[in-house]
Amino acid sequence: VTFHQRTALATSALPTVRLIHTSDLHIGASLDERGQAIELAVLEAVVDSMTAARGDLLLVAGDFFDNNRVGRATVEKTNAVLDRLPPWSSLVVLPGNHDSFGPDSVYRRYRIGSPGRTVILDDPAGRCVLFAQHRLRVWGRPTITHSENFRPLAGAPARQPYQWNVVMAHGHFTGEASQCDPPRSSPISAGELRGVGADYIALGHWDLRADVSSGGATAWYSGAPFHGWQLGAVQDVLLGPGRQVRVTERPLSGPGEAAIGGRRSEETGRPAQVIGRTDR
């Protein structure tokens, strides 16, 4: 891109883009048939939300799968649901701590999603993907080893004024401190969020929805889309005129509700406290 092209891009209006942000689906966690059916029903509800919202990109910010031992049958059933994503949309998946991108990763062993429409953020140093039609780029650094030394936002690229800048990360928010006491694995500090310079930071790792925006950085944990036998919600993120970012909660619904046995409660829709799962 030349200087004159950059100037023209910077002064022209960015297109409106809608993101659907989710995380922590933990597909493959259940060993019984009913549990497996529920996992797929939740994914169906997430996919249906893309169609209903006319979402452009579906962002899965870690722990799409519960572990790296999931087999071919689970992946094939997952892909059958992902094939229902609307034809205009794309899927971006960031490996988290449960489905980390190590040598035995499910993402190395199997194809996930439709070729040409699915991106796995699989570079240990961080991968940046440009969606030219939306003038939007997505960056994320996959979890390789879930430890206190892994900083999910390390190496994030500088902000580009002529594009939408979206960052994905999977880890534990530590507030203004750089680390917790006792230390937590995959820490993310408020200072790191501010330093990224992204228009939106899609976070995963916490099961409950939480706004951890800091300074000018709009950063949210989507929370898991399923809570206690009830469908939850996804984040509906509209990148719009004037470089405004509007984040709303979109409750999930659909045919899968009957299989699951209920809908989200009011409790699951409330902002989360700053907590994380104890097994992480």
Show where each model-derived region lies.
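Short, mixed charged/polar active-site loops
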Residues: 16-18, 135, 244-245
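His/Asp/Glu-rich metal-coordinating catalytic cores
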Residues: 57, 68-229
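N-terminal active-site segment of His-dependent metallophosphoesterases
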Residues: 1-81, 87
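Non-catalytic terminal accessory segments
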Residues: 1-17, 259, 266-280
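Binuclear metal-dependent phosphoesterase catalytic core
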Residues: 125-132, 219-278
